[in-house]
Amino acid sequence: MANKREFPLDRTRNIGIMAHIDAGKTTTTERILYYTGKIHKIGETHEGASQMDWMPQEQERGITITSAATTAFWKDHRVNIIDTPGHVDFTIEVERSLRVLDGAITVLDAQSGVEPQTENVWRQATTYGVPRLVFVNKMDKIGADFDYSMTTLHDRLQANAHAVQMPIGAEDKFEGVIDLIEMKADLYDEDELGTKWDTVDVPDDYKEAAQKAHNDLIEAVADVDDGIMDKYLEGEEISNAELKAAIRKATINLEFYPVLAGSAFKNKGVQMLLDAVIDYLPSPLDVRPYHATDPDTGDAVELTAGDDKPFAALAFKVATDPFVGRLTYIRVYSGTLEAGSYVLNATKDNRERVGRLLQMHSNHREEIPEVFSGDIAAAIGLKNTTTGDSLTDVDHPLILESLDVPDPVIQVSIEPDSKEDQDKLDVGLQKLSEEDPTFKAETNPETGETLIAGMGELHLDIMVDRLKREFKVAAKVGEPQVAYRETFTKETSAQGKFVRQSGGKGQYGDVWIEFTPNEEGKGFEFENAIVGGVVPREYIPAVEQGLKEAMANGVLAGYPLIDVKAKLYDGSYHEVDSSEAAFKVAASMALKNASKSAGAVILEPIMHVEVVAPEEYLGDVMGQITARRGRVEGMEARGNAQLVNSMVPLAEMFGYATTLRSATQGRGTFTMTFDHYEAVPKSIQAEIIKKNGGGVATKD
């Protein structure tokens, strides 16, 4: 018998909470869970006892690493919340959660307003078309300034953001909020942990400011809604319901961002934030259709939510749970799925059985018999499904848009303390790289070293920490290494001829290949331009494969060769002695020969580095950036501090956190994201080649 859906789709919300590190995101989530009746005792992040931060590393560091998905209930609505990390090393977690959300709350610190990482996640949310509310948190903090935070939304994000609430007081005088639509004030009782408040008329000393803010709000909504504009111009009454409906529509269309105020820590304003989630953020029925592709025909398909449609879901996270093993978090876009049934992994084209289905509450779980359209849940039993895979009805395969996964930019060598731990290390690394596609582990074929690669030093620290805790592997980690690449800068042609015809079965392969530089980010492109069968068709894939394998080991210092086009245009073969293996070797020889005249260069990752520091340290900060081969691209004032935008090679950024701390007496902060690859200066290229043994010897 089919199970009954508990909440209709229009009363479902899938939301994320996103912010700069330390803006109070986890505390806000905590309070939402507390007021929706999910927790009985509030955990404070800075005491290491938060509900959402469930990995031991997160509780120790007071930061959120993995986006735990939690279900809460408010006013007859189901709200699925995904907690996202605010640290830039974990952008894949943010991308992942934004891909499966319908709406988001952006949390700002009332003292700092929009911070660098807020800008990053805001940009990502815009890319994925996610409607947002803004919660100006920490209104009780010294230096809290609601108007300043509003200004930063306009200046730094160019967001059409407008207050739907106004704070009453600030810092230790913060008492509550004024609802600028209903024109009522909500004053909190200090002793009741925010569970009780009085709704009263707007206090006299706020009446004038509140009325002006109310009028500004109506004007702002009129700018994005023709119906409100007509009434406004005619001087007609606009009802609260009409105003809310117009705000909802404009918010869902990404034309308007409602702003609310509060203090999660002091338990003020969280219930009104929940009301705004219900009032203004979309249900799965309100969002634009999801794009999918039919793998059989290649046709684009639009998916809309509905239980009566074939099942389609995206696996957006894989996690290893200490009690139930491998959990696959899924977002259901259409249809329903019962525990125990089969699904098709359309990405890998294989069938898998879903053993059990769980609804997650941070790290508690509740078994459920079935999931419905719009749900977020965790499945047990999917052995071959990885992040970004599409799971569909067996008879209706679809590929949903997958995630953009950035390549790792930093690597370190890792070796277990004892030989016995090697197997455990291998298992641990395999599991961690399944969970996190930006974390890669590989063995260097020449040295036998195990290398791990990721998005930053903190990312790798946490992975090594997890190996120790979850897989009981004690390991030594080497110095961080930069993930260099190589490329060609000139067009050239070369022959590769491999002949071995003395005794036994001979070998013969002969190719002429033209190499040209490709556009940045386009990768390797191979073209077969053979005419008249001078290289038989069955050997063409071997030529391409031989090039790929040789490119993986580079031509200068052993780093992968990228962004090159190769055109096979001539060659010869031997009726008896030619083989795939011979053409593979010939192709690698052509690459090696071409490298002498192709202007081969080593590329290094260039990071976009944003430093925020008080004005008085500006000279030191800029001096340090220049000393690290960096380019300052621009500066802007951030309150009484300065933000310095720069491009700096990753190789020069190791240990920068310590340098910045001491230069600014602990008051400077920075964020760093990968931007592009660039050729290293000649002198540094020579050093790298020398250090790596002067180029790679290809095996004959």
UniProtKB/Swiss-Prot annotation:
Recite the UniProt keywords alphabetically.
Answer: Cytoplasm, Elongation factor, GTP-binding, Nucleotide-binding, Protein biosynthesis
Cellular localisation: Cytoplasm
* Chief site of localization: cytoplasm
- Lipoprotein as a keyword? no
Q: Which GO terms describe its biological process?
A: ribosome disassembly
tr-type G domain sequence ranges? 10-285
Query: What is a single cellular component term in the Gene Ontology annotation?
Result: cytoplasm
Q: Which GO terms describe its molecular function?
A: GTP binding; GTPase activity; translation elongation factor activity
Record flagged with keyword Chloroplast = no
Q: HAMAP family, from UniProt?
A: EF_G_EF_2_B (MF_00054_B)
Q: What is this protein called?
A: Elongation factor G
Task: Provide the gene name from the record.
Answer: fusA
